[in-house]
Regions:
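Short loop/turn motifs at secondary-structure junctions
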Residues: 29, 84, 145, 192-193
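N-terminal basic/disordered segments at the start of proteins
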Residues: 11-20
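Residue-level signal for inorganic ion chemistry
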Residues: 25, 88, 199, 217
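C-terminal helical cap(s) of enzyme catalytic domains, especially alpha/beta-barrels
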Residues: 48-58, 99-102, 189, 200, ...
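A short, Lys/Arg-enriched amphipathic alpha-helix followed by its capping loop at the start of a domain
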Residues: 24-30, 58
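A generic "structured core" feature
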Residues: 111, 175, 195-198, 205, ...
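Conserved anion-binding
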Residues: 34-43, 55-184
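Alpha-helix N-cap and loop-to-helix initiation/capping positions
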Residues: 17, 42-50, 125-132, 208-216
Length: 229
């Protein structure tokens, strides 16, 4: 699964947890869908067995992604090796050693999430200059050995955007997350030209995936891709 520039921009809908979510995602037809696995604090949490059951009805055209937060390496590898998921997305404090140990199990496609610095961190001159904070962060993201990086405002699924101009520091393809949805997705694509977009809470109503919002979000990205040709 090679990573090239997002042409067309790829689409990932994340946080599926119910059979009806699978019905909706099959209708919307994004490129990827995400399952949050073994993260009890998430309202979208699923168990490996739940994902296996949901996966059976997922369209083969949609690539399933497992989203993890500091999960034991062997558990992630097991789900990749048995085909439950095809991509591992790391959303915790996983480091280069973690990625190295995961790759020892096989040739896997790995996405590593990075939290974009908040204004208070950037302006905290007591520790580092704003320029140093940004350069250190960008250097870490650019040097990640993951196949793809994801930029978010925090732990994922918060529905809040980050300062988009900071993404200009990244010199590699990236997946854009954090408050991206039907209402602002065209603006985000025009400004940042990401490899792909990752949406979760923005395609929900009352904490549940919303079929109409999922269809609208995917439709707007497809339209943007078509107009870009």
């Amino acid at each position: 699964m090679a990573v090239m520039s997002g042409n067309p921009v790829k689409i990932k809908l994340c946080g599926l947890s119910r059979p009806v979510d699978i019905d909706s995602v099959n209708e919307a037809k994004p490129d990827y869908c995400g399952f949050i696995i073994n993260v009890p604090k998430s309202i979208r949490n699923t168990t490996p067995d739940q994902v296996r059951a949901l996966r059976k009805n997922l369209s083969p055209e949609i690539i399933p992604v497992g989203v993890f937060r500091n999960e034991p390496v062997e558990n992630v590898a097991e789900l990749l090796l048995d085909g439950t998921i095809q991509v591992a997305q790391l959303h915790g404090s996983e480091d280069e050693d973690y990625i190295r140990r995961l790759r020892a199990y096989g040739t896997f496609f790995i996405i590593q999430a990075f939290r974009v610095p908040i204004p208070e961190e950037i302006s905290d001159i007591r520790t580092r200059s704003p320029e140093k904070v940004l350069s250190d962060w960008a250097d870490m993201v650019n040097k990640s050995s993951a196949d793809l990086v994801l930029l978010d405002n925090g732990g994922g699924g918060t529905g809040k955007t980050f300062e988009w101009t900071l993404a200009n520091q990244i010199q590699r393809p990236f997946l854009l997350a954090g408050g991206i949805g039907p209402d602002n997705i065209t603006e985000a694509l025009d400004q940042l030209h990401p490899w792909g977009v990752d949406m979760s809470s923005s395609v929900e109503t009352d904490g549940k995936k919303d079929r109409k919002k999922m269809l609208a979000a995917v439709s707007r990205v497809r339209a943007w891709n078509k107009n870009r040709r």
